[in-house]
Amino acid sequence: MGTAQVLPGILQKHCCILPDRNTESQCTLCGEPEEEEGGDLAQPGLSFPGPAEEDIDQQYSWSPTQHFSEERYSPAPRNMKGLTGSRNQPQLCVGHTCGLSPTDECEHPHDHVRHGPDVRQPYLLSPAESCPMDHHRCSPRSSVHSECMMMPVMLGDHVSSSTFPRMHYSSHYDTRDDCATSHASTKVNRIPANLLDQFEKQLPLHRDGFHTLQYHRASAATEQRNESPGRIRHLVHSVQKLFTKSHSLEGSSKSNINGTKSEGRMDDHHQSHLSKHSKRSKSKERKPESKHKSGMSSWWSSDDNLDSDSTYRTPSVAHRHHMDHIPHCYPEALQSPFGDLSLKTSKSNSDVKCSACEGLALTPDTRYMKRSSWSTLTVSQAKEAYRKSSLNLDKPLVHPEIKPSLQPCHYLQVPQDDWGAYPTGGKEEEIPCRRMRSGSYIKAMGDEESGESDSSPKTSPTVALRPEPLLKSIIQRPLGDHQTQSYLQAATEVPVGHSLDPSVNYNSPKFRSRNQSYMRAVSTLSQASCVSQMSEAEVNGQFESVCESVFSEVESQAMDALDLPGCFRTRSHSYLRAIQAGYSQDDECIPVMTPSNMTSTIRSTAAVSYTNYKKTPPPVPPRTTSKPLISVTAQSSTESTQDAYQDSRAQRMSPWPQDSRGGLYNSMDSLDSNKAMNLALESAAAQRHAADTQSSSTRSIDKAVLVSKAEELLKSRCSSIGVQDSEFPDHQPYPRSDVETATDSDTESRGLREYHSVGVQVEDEKRHGRFKRSNSVTAAVQADLELEGFPGHVSMEDKGLQFGSSFQRHSEPSTPTQYGALRTVRTQGLFSYREDYRTQVDTSTLPPPDPWLEPSLDTVETGRMSPCRRDGSWFLKLLHTETKKMEGWCKEMEREAEENDLSEEILGKIRSAVGSAQLLMSQKFQQFYWLCQQNMDPSAMPRPTSQDLAGYWDMLQLSVEDVSMKFDELHQLKLNDWKIMESPERKEERKIPPPIPKKPPKGKFPITREKSLDLPDRQRQEARRRLMAAKRAASFRQNSATERADSIEIYIPEAQTRL
């Protein structure tokens, strides 16, 4: 307890919180042993019912009561060597955190929790003893949690008296006051009696004390972690700035909250602030400013709250140390009581906390639920959604061991699994202390500084750090556990970490402490992702809905729970979102890594690569390249942020290149088909080698395979399924043309078969990637959902997939070459003309598509059959036919011009017709070809609909009609031996139109005007009208789609900020 010793006075003042921030010792709940144990966090923190502890406990077991006196607390130096009685007393309060002012109450609850006869032991031991198996975890969480479960009231008081000032609720307010007084005395061991009186009078002081304590604790923990207060201070300052921004936005609402909370805490806060300010100064945290700013509002001053979780948590740290547990269980619940400081809050706190600890839905208190509930409710809702989506969160989770804790995570009972679910081991203690650390950004930062994976991501400055620490922690864990934990932790970050492992918990607690409710909601979503990894397709769509519902609910609940730190949440959400995006990136990468371990890891973001990465992990770097594509994912905000972090993440995740590249980058890559294709091309080259080594061995057998691979690569690229894409990229990009024609049918079939084996997976993965995107509210949601329903078979069916996984992937390519390569091969060379319509257009090319379709049909019959429908594939066939026809006309006319000595007038007509046809094919046909490709690419953004294609086709028909008229005229001349038989007037008319037709689209209009009497003209007029109507409709749809995409893109960043 060097820290405790270093900060004895502070520790005394702040009793259990600071003492063992470093330790797993649960100074918060049982914190005494922590000091006793010399920072032995594990058991000491739990403060097993040793005689001394019992004596102290007995001595202070009633400490929650008003009987606590400053002297009394001070005599108990035993809690923490530095704290002396201070820590113990607060812990006694914690012990009596049950909120039972009477010793008996505390004792009984503690006995209940502790399962020990001695209530005083329970006080210290109760947290530890209440969950003996939870000793490490139990101590802080167990104490609160156990007490919470054992004695909701006790929990309230426990929170109140111990580190959970915010958990102190009116119901136990008296006790809490006493407790606070005791606490204050304890904290105020170095505080004058008058301050003690004020503390006693004002519960807020406790919070401030705890708050300060938390900062101090963070500092101490930081120091223990060899982190300088200055560094922590810097981190805190950074976080404060971030939070200040959100706070400025949320300040008003927070002010109200603070008003409520600060009223009761104003004096305490000032006093605590005074005493804590030095400590805060000691930790150099922005909190002192907050406290100064909001003397009374300090607890919940918007600035305090928003400036730092540490403020939010720091005041809470005592409460946070417990509240870390409780907030972990009910981060918001604690807050809400603080906002209310009323009996109802206290009651609700106890009830909710107990329920949360017990894994209840946190239904007890609306506010409690609102705070904890916006996470909790969203979590439970998410779980319900997951269940509905047959995610079977419990089942999908990789490990049964994880499942129990995961459920709590889902239920936002992370505290439960943290406190109750893992009452075993010093990790509980560690986690609580860590959580305390994580409780404040300083702590989180400090943890980051210390290289704690939990805290690293917490601090925005160290957000980048988190991935590595997280990876470290994940890597440190067993691979299976690691994949689950890393994934779960990544997905559910805190909750999963908690549920996964106390160890993991300590990682997640930071997140939890930062914005536990938010983190839980996000974690729940992440867990949904984890679960979705379990059932990829199924989860993705449902995960998307869950994400929407959870995020929306979380947001709404967060707003409802704004009495808690709604502002904090908002700020925390934006900041945490960014952080989570940062660590989530890592987590996603890790989950993606985990997916490598578990193919079913379909984490929305990482899902895409789960199959591919297995096959071709190497492409990760290319994925990293493509990751910039679009950061729109199911966890849109997180993934978007992740996209921002993906480079670093990918680098960090390079150890896990298989998963990270495939999973994390895919969705974003898929989102931006153009970028994805460009990146895909780039990564195709990069991945070519890795993919070639992997898939080349199997697919580089022939060009056809290469072509299919290339197509798949493009498709995968587009869909950001780099693995298989990588396989194909090496071969695909260039052999595409020649291979296309030659190997279209044979190669296509083989490639298709291979592709189906691999390509379908790619598509599935792509779907999953899209799901991520769709989760982030992308237009791909429909396609994703469709694909989701049908992992491989239907996946192709899904529009792009229908046209073959390659089509789906192909549509993404934004580069003509890619399209030509992909589409030509995949499109059966039908649109080879893309690159060179005339050269590409070839019956040989066209037939291959059929064989290719057939193979596709084998894997994705509906997908291959889909071309029969009026979709991109169908229109591509039409376009191909039209192109071939037009090319034939051009060749014929050119041949006629060469073979015959034609007049300049006729030659002009031929040149006009041929030029118009070539221009039409090279421009409008090409455009339409790309539209068809995009239509077939479910990941295309925006993705043209079949109606759009139909409208554009109608438009093309006008141009085609004009060109056809020219060739008809030439044909008539040819039949007439190239003699112009028409009357001068007619000739005039005909002469005029040819020049006009040179203007491809415009020529038709003049012709129409000139030949308004001709039947073709009337038909053209009608066609033009239809075209204009279709064009307007298509334009509207396209604009709407674009707007949707924009709004989505905008929305996602917003979600990133808000969620």
Curated annotation (Swiss-Prot):
Query: Keyword Magnesium, does the record have it?
Result: no
Bias category Basic and acidic residues: which stretches?
Answer: 262-271, 747-756, 1007-1024
Principal location listed in the UniProt entry: membrane
Give the GO terms filed under biological process for this record. Answer: modulation of chemical synaptic transmission; neuron-neuron synaptic transmission
Cellular location(s):
Cell membrane; Postsynaptic density; Synapse
User: GO MF annotations for this entry?
Assistant: guanylate kinase activity; molecular adaptor activity; protein domain specific binding
Q: From start to end residue, where is composition biased (Polar residues)? A: 244-261, 632-645
PTM Phosphoserine: list the residues: 302, 308, 390, 456, 667, 670, 673, 720, 745, 776, 811, 983, 1012
A single GO cellular-component term from the record reads: glutamatergic synapse
Disordered: annotated span: 31-56, 244-311, 446-466, 632-669, 723-756, 985-1024
Q: Which domain of life is it from?
A: Eukaryota
UniProtKB keywords: Cell membrane, Membrane, Phosphoprotein, Synapse
Q: How does it assemble?
A: Interacts with DLG4/PSD-95.
Question: What protein family is recorded?
Answer: Belongs to the SAPAP family.
What is the documented function of this protein? May play a role in the molecular organization of synapses and neuronal cell signaling. Could be an adapter protein linking ion channel to the subsynaptic cytoskeleton. May induce enrichment of PSD-95/SAP90 at the plasma membrane.
Identification of the protein by name: Disks large-associated protein 2
Organism encoding this protein: Rattus norvegicus
Per the record, the gene is Dlgap2
